Amino acid sequence: CAAIPAVYSRRQSFGFETGRAIMELIRKDIRPCDIITRQSILNAIRVNSAIGGSTNAVLHLLAIAYQAGVDLSIFEFGKVSMEIPHLVPMIPAGKYTLLDFYEAGGIQVILKELGDKIYRQCMTCTGQTVEENLKRVVNRNPDVIRPLDHPAHPYGGIAILRGNLAPAGAVTKPSAIPQEAHDFTGPAKIFENEEDALRGIRALEIKGGEVVVIRNMGPKGGPGMPEMYKAMKL
C-alpha cells in the first residue's frame, strides 16, 4: 500500500479495500495482538533490511514492540542486517525509484524472495498467513528486487553501532553511504540542536572533511527523533 504512487487511482481503491479488510477482521475476531507478535516484528525487521529501509524503522518497531509486550533490543536490528542482505538498489542506495519497486511487485515480492528467512505462518491483516498471501506473487523485475543469491549489497540496510559516543547503541544506514566514507577520520562540528545546525550550515561554518554532530535530537530531546533532512539537504 505505501509503495502505490500518489497519482495512481489504485491508491483510492486500496483505501476502500482497507476498510473492507478491517470489517472482515472484526467479523473474524482477529485482533492486533493476533497479528503483532515477536515473529511478525522480526519479519518486519528483515524486510526493512532487505529493502534498505529507513532508520526510522528502528524507532517505530521498538515502540510497537513495547506496546505489544514484545521483548525487542536495538541490537537485534544489527544482527538481522548481518543475515539479510540488501536486495533493492533503490535511491539513495541505487538507481531505481519507488515506482520501479512498486511495479516490480513491492513488499510482497520481498517477502517471497526472502523465502525461509521469514516466519511464513504469521497471521496478517488479510486474515490469512504470510505463506497464503504469497502463493500467487511473482517478481516482475529481478533487477529491481534481487534474489537472495544476487543481492545489491551483501549486508542489510541498517547497521547498529556502539562505542564511547553511543554506549547504548546508534543507528546508521550503510547502504546509502559511499564506500569511501565507511572508514573516515576527521574533526567534529558540534551543534546543540537542529536550529543551530541550520544556522551554522547556512553561515558556511562547515569545512570539507568535518563531521556534523547535532545533539539533543533523539526520542526525548527532539522530541520524537525527527529526521535531519533539512541539514542533509543543505
Please place each PLM-identified region on the residue numbering.
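Catalytic or ion-coupling anion/metal-binding cores of large enzyme and transporter domains
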Residues: C1-L234
